[in-house]
Every structure is written in C-alpha cells, then in structure tokens.
C-alpha cells in the first residue's frame, strides 16, 4: 500500500474577541496541537490581529484572525474540521491547499 505524502495547507482561523489573551493563546494551541497530533507540522503562524467581520457571527462583529501554514496528509483535513466544529472559541475556519508559505503578510488591524 502506498503511503500518502503530506501536503502544504493554509488555514485561516477566526477566534472570538471575548477571549482573554491567555484563553486565545490556548485556543490557538488547541488548533495547532490538533494538527501535530495527526502527524502534521506547523511551518508558520501569522497573527493578523483583531479585525472587523464581514457579517455578524454568533453575535460577534469582530474577531482575532490567524493564518497558519502547515503540512499534513490530506485525509487528516476532514478529522481536523470535525474538531474545529466542536471548538466554541473558533468562529470560522477555512483550509486551502497552498503553493508556498508566505513569510510576510500585509494587513491593517483594528485598534484594541
């Protein structure tokens, strides 16, 4: 049986602004540990800061955005999505295949 090769992914995650800094760090750690627990590797995490949402999600108008580049075997993505749906601190997430890790992102954050 042929072993599947890990692919590069770009994950966008939006966390609730009601979280304290410590709770937000733990929520992000829960996402990253989920990836590594399935044999994935975190390559880069971009903290994009607090931003206004395009529309209200669960009563929230703003969220903390993170962009994570990671590698994992493709079959793991469905398992990660199941975990993300159970994470109440995570307002939204999106996972896409990526061609390369972007080292620099340019976004403006809202003032705290």
Curated annotation (Swiss-Prot):
Gene3D superfamilies reported for this sequence: 3.30.70.60
Q: What is the protein name for this chain?
A: Small ribosomal subunit protein bS6
- Source organism: Chlamydia caviae (strain ATCC VR-813 / DSM 19441 / 03DC25 / GPIC) (Chlamydophila caviae)
GO-annotated molecular function: small ribosomal subunit rRNA binding; structural constituent of ribosome
Mind telling me which HAMAP family this protein's record contains? Answer: Ribosomal_bS6 (MF_00360)
Q: Which PANTHER family does the entry link to?
A: MITOCHONDRIAL 28S RIBOSOMAL PROTEIN S6, SMALL RIBOSOMAL SUBUNIT PROTEIN BS6M
The UniProt entry, under InterPro entries, shows: Ribosomal_bS6, Ribosomal_bS6_sf, Ribosomal_S6_plastid/chlpt, Transl_elong_EF1B/ribsomal_bS6
Q: Which family does it belong to?
A: Belongs to the bacterial ribosomal protein bS6 family.
Some GO term, biological process aspect, for this entry: which one?
Answer: translation
Instruction: Name the job this protein performs.
Output: Binds together with bS18 to 16S ribosomal RNA.
- State if Repressor is listed as a keyword: no
Q: Which UniProt keywords apply?
A: Ribonucleoprotein, Ribosomal protein, RNA-binding, rRNA-binding
Statement: the UniProt record of this protein carries the keyword DNA-binding: no
Instruction: Provide one Gene Ontology cellular component.
Output: cytoplasm
């Amino acid at each position: 049986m042929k072993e599947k090769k890990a692919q590069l992914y770009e994950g966008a995650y939006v966390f609730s602004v009601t979280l304290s800094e410590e709770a937000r760090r733990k929520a992000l750690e829960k996402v990253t540990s989920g990836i590594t627990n399935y044999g994935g590797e975190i390559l880069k995490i971009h903290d994009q800061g607090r931003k206004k949402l395009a529309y209200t999600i669960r009563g929230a108008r703003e969220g903390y955005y993170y962009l994570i580049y990671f590698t994992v075997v493709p079959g793991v993505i469905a398992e990660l999505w199941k975990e993300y749906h159970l994470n109440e601190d995570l307002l939204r997430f999106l996972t896409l295949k990526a061609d390369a890790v972007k080292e620099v992102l340019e976004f403006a954050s809202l003032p705290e």
